[in-house]
């Protein structure tokens, strides 16, 4: 467990934990599903700009070419599984080495991605309505695209992702994917990517191999634009997003498509500490469009309160090892002001934010369900990725020599919702207190009331899975 995770765990101690310990009475709790699920799909479509490549003369319904492997599970070895002490110690040292390498590559990746995540959020989360995007889904799509491109097209993407070459990118993508991935029954954080190739066109096998091995990408082939293949793509997206985006289906492909790339995130987890529905109440939320009545949830807990130049923030722990940040702009400061500064993203990515203190926070959080489908094209062009959108400049020769293709569109559909599921949860008191004792002094209480536009970030191991602005819960 890294220092940041340990600090988060030790500082999140609810009053209910203290009360329960004093009474020595077990209780059952309701639990919240964060995102009765949260999900996102980034869709990258590249279309032919010439008709010189051979057209397929037969129809197939998306034949499977390659299926991505399961993420590496670097589980701690059990001594009972080894015949000798030396064999166990060797396995243990290998485990620690692999964990350290993954952690190092992830930190390198996040250092390089900080600007993209912050600047992308400022570009994609605009307007007075609710806004949402998935930084990690966009990252996985762009990283895969870098592997398939060449020349200046590739250099522009690599620069945006903060790396110099695809060898480094492969290591970092694997570490991001594996760090963000969790599958604990009802508590999940799953990433998936698929590449759909046009039947009848040959492609570079080494690039396909790299996508499968290092990017955890499944590769399919079919008649792009056909009813059968379109249905297969829709089924794949729905399966990997828990059917949460069924109202935002993938765009219909046309027969001149060369390949299509889809990257998804599916997230579902329960709070470590519950919000009891009996404490819900209705009150005013000060939306840019005018005051409106919304349903609020309430809870009080001992946790870390972070300060930025123009915002305050708290984070709540989740059962799958993730955290959800709630970022409240100061009075007379807008969500856009916070987004433009980018400091909040530094805080989310930080291993140890300097301006923080342990407080008793009386939380008041509105229930919300935010969903959006948007184009990422204009924002990516502002961030310096331009050639892939030009029929004259796009270079995808890494996938196939002299492949006459360009990016026709990049769309992303996302949804995040938080509410009470009313399901009984497990005890969490021992986990929170493990390895530490509560402070002797009672912290000063604060009221953290999200009754005006605010930001949120859902992160796993400091990797921002979802970033959004709630203007109208």
What does each of the following model-derived ranges do?
Residues 1-4, 16-66:
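Membrane-interface helical sensory segment of bacterial ECF anti-sigma factor regulators
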Residues 14-18, 145-150, 199-203, 269:
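Short alpha-helix boundary/capping elements
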Residues 56-157, 296, 437, 442-443, ...:
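Flexible propeptides and autoinhibitory/regulatory segments associated with cysteine proteases
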Residues 156-161, 279:
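Short, surface-exposed beta-strand/strand-loop-strand elements in extracellular ectodomains
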């Amino acid at each position: 467990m890294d220092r940041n995770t340990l600090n988060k765990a030790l500082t999140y101690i609810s009053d209910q934990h203290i009360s329960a310990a004093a009474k020595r009475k077990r209780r059952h709790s309701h639990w919240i599903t964060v995102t009765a699920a949260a999900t996102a799909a980034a869709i990258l479509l590249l279309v032919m700009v010439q008709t010189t490549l051979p057209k397929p003369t037969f129809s197939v319904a998306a034949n499977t070419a390659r299926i991505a492997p399961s993420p590496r599970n670097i589980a701690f070895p059990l001594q009972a599984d080894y015949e000798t002490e030396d064999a166990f110690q060797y396995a243990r040292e290998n485990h620690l080495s692999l964990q350290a390498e993954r952690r190092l590559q992830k930190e390198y990746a996040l250092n390089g991605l900080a600007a993209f995540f912050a600047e992308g959020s400022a570009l994609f989360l605009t307007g007075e309505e609710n806004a949402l995007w998935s930084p990690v889904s966009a990252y996985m799509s762009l990283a895969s695209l870098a592997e398939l491109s060449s020349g200046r097209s590739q250099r522009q993407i690599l620069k945006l992702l903060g790396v110099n070459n695809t060898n480094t990118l492969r290591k970092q993508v694997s570490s991001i994917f594996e760090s963000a991935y969790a599958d604990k029954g009802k508590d999940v954080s799953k990433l998936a990517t698929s590449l759909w190739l046009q039947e009848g066109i040959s492609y570079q096998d080494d690039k396909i191999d790299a996508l499968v091995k290092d990017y955890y990408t499944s590769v399919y082939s079919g008649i792009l634009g056909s009813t059968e293949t379109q249905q297969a793509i829709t089924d794949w997206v729905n399966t990997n997003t828990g059917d949460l985006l069924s109202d935002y289906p993938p765009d219909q492909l046309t027969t001149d498509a060369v390949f299509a790339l889809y990257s998804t995130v599916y997230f579902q987890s329960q709070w470590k500490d519950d919000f009891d529905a009996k404490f819900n109440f209705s009150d005013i939320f000060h939306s840019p469009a005018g005051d409106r009545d919304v349903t609020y949830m309430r809870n009080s807990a001992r946790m870390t309160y972070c300060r930025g130049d123009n915002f305050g923030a708290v984070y709540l722990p989740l059962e799958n090892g993730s955290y959800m940040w709630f970022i409240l702009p100061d009075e007379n400061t807008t969500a856009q002001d916070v987004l433009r500064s980018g400091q909040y993203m530094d805080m989310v990515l930080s291993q140890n934010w300097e301006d923080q203190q342990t407080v008793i926070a009386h939380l008041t959080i509105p229930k919300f369900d935010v969903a959006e489908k948007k184009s990422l094209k204009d924002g990516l062009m502002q961030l310096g990725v331009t050639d892939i959108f030009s029929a004259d400049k796009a270079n995808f020769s890494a996938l196939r020599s002299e492949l006459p293709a360009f990016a026709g569109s990049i769309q992303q559909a996302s949804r995040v919702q938080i509410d009470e599921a009313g399901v009984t949860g497990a005890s969490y008191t021992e986990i929170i207190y493990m390895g530490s004792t509560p402070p002797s002094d009672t912290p000063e209480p604060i009221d953290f009331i999200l009754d005006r536009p605010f930001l949120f970030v859902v992160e796993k191991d400091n990797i921002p899975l979802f970033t959004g602005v709630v203007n109208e819960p």
